[in-house]
């Protein structure tokens, strides 16, 4: 989505605009959130995933568009702040990163009953 498209879209349907956004930068521009491109370049997917996690606990149905946009902006700012202060490895938003540090369950030795041997 180009900058001109972002500016000409109606502000009433911010959720729809966010769903059509083509990049993390579009989210920041749509919601008027300042960001450091260096942080976004490293953690773009992590920031958007965390934003989604935070939004899951928000009830946006039936809210006026200005309130919806304000809540989305607050959630994006919170998600972005998580990655300004620490790295994606520290935050472990994605399952693959969580699994990398999960304690391994002890492996049971293979057991074959003598009755099964012939």
From Swiss-Prot:
Keywords: Nitrogen fixation. Disulfide bonds: none annotated. Transmembrane segments: none annotated. Pfam families: NifW. InterPro entries: NifW. One of its GO terms (biological process) is nitrogen fixation. The keyword NAD does not apply. Homotrimer; associates with NifD. Belongs to the NifW family. May protect the nitrogenase Fe-Mo protein from oxidative damage. This is Nitrogenase-stabilizing/protective protein NifW. It comes from Rhodopseudomonas palustris (strain BisB5). The gene is nifW.
